[in-house]
Amino acid sequence: MAVQISKKRKFVADGIFKAELNEFLTRELAEDGYSGVEVRVTPTRTEIIILATRTQNVLGEKGRRIRELTAVVQKRFGFPEGSVELYAEKVATRGLCAIAQAESLRYKLLGGLAVRRACYGVLRFIMESGAKGCEVVVSGKLRGQRAKSMKFVDGLMIHSGDPVNYYVDTAVRHVLLRQGVLGIKVKIMLPWDPSGKIGPKKPLPDHVSIVEPKDEIVPTTPISEQKAAKPDQPQPPAMPQPVATA
């Protein structure tokens, strides 16, 4: 007999499942450019789509790794046999994915690249990918014992209002270096895209689109038009004048 749970509890349970799944995949697929996960529930099975920049590494040799991940997810979350399927999907535009860029910056810093040089490299790549703006903040023991933060900004960035929810992609990562832990925060402002592929379909509220005027057809030969004469309008009857009384 199926146990009935309230809508509130179901939303909470779904949120916990997605958060735990995201944390597990972030740890497991960090080196493969993991960029997020989508969960689609159908009446017969649950489909989990893993978004990554290097999908071949996620799949593994002859699909071995994806089968191992499927078995782990099935066992950990108590799915019945064969009711869960994992798919790997390539991120369309790597430069517009904040998680992918935060991971890229993390590995650059782990490789010993200078903070300023690594951040400017990421900033340039994001802007070349077609972003409207971006912001990279690195904080921690950058030089010496005193902690400080460095902010690198380019282009346009909105910070308030409802459009932030669908125009700004944000990611936070931590990297452990010899001098301590550094925090990385990447914010990317996506461009407006009417097709909805690389950015939101809905334009910004202050966006003004100017319609191009239609081209007028210039007559090449002189023409004359005979306009019909207006019919005579009937005159309104004269108002009777008041008669003065003695």
Curated annotation (Swiss-Prot):
Enzyme Commission (EC) number: 4.2.99.18
Residue stretches making up the KH type-2 domain: 21-92
Membrane protein topology class: Peripheral membrane protein
Catalytic activity: 2'-deoxyribonucleotide-(2'-deoxyribose 5'-phosphate)-2'-deoxyribonucleotide-DNA = a 3'-end 2'-deoxyribonucleotide-(2,3-dehydro-2,3-deoxyribose 5'-phosphate)-DNA + a 5'-end 5'-phospho-2'-deoxyribonucleoside-DNA + H(+)
GO terms assigned for molecular function: class I DNA-(apurinic or apyrimidinic site) endonuclease activity; DNA binding; RNA binding; structural constituent of ribosome
InterPro entries: KH_dom-like_a/b (IPR015946), KH_dom_type_2 (IPR004044), KH_sf_prok-type (IPR009019), Ribosomal_S3_C_sf (IPR036419), Ribosomal_uS3_C (IPR001351), Ribosomal_uS3_CS (IPR018280), Ribosomal_uS3_euk/arc (IPR005703)
Locations listed in the record: Cytoplasm; Nucleus; Nucleus, Nucleolus; Mitochondrion inner membrane
Gene Ontology biological-process annotations: apoptotic process; cell division; DNA repair; positive regulation of apoptotic signaling pathway; regulation of translation; translation
Domain of life from the UniProt record: Eukaryota
Alphabetic keyword roster: Apoptosis, Cell cycle, Cell division, Cytoplasm, Cytoskeleton, DNA damage, DNA repair, DNA-binding, Lyase, Membrane, Mitochondrion, Mitochondrion inner membrane, Mitosis, Nucleus, Ribonucleoprotein, Ribosomal protein, RNA-binding, Transcription, Transcription regulation, Translation regulation
GO cellular component, one term: nucleolus
SUPFAM superfamilies: Prokaryotic type KH domain (KH-domain type II) (SSF54814), Ribosomal protein S3 C-terminal domain (SSF54821)
Predominant localisation class: cytoplasm
Segments for region (Disordered): 215-246
Pfam families noted in UniProt: KH_2 (PF07650), Ribosomal_S3_C (PF00189)
Family: Belongs to the universal ribosomal protein uS3 family.
Function: Component of the small ribosomal subunit. The ribosome is a large ribonucleoprotein complex responsible for the synthesis of proteins in the cell. Has endonuclease activity and plays a role in repair of damaged DNA. Also involved in other processes including regulation of transcription, translation of its cognate mRNA, spindle formation and chromosome movement during mitosis, and apoptosis.
Stored PANTHER family: 30S/40S RIBOSOMAL PROTEIN S3 (PTHR11760), SMALL RIBOSOMAL SUBUNIT PROTEIN US3 (PTHR11760:SF32)
Identification of the protein by name: Small ribosomal subunit protein uS3A
Organism, as annotated: Xenopus laevis
Gene name linked to the record: rps3-a
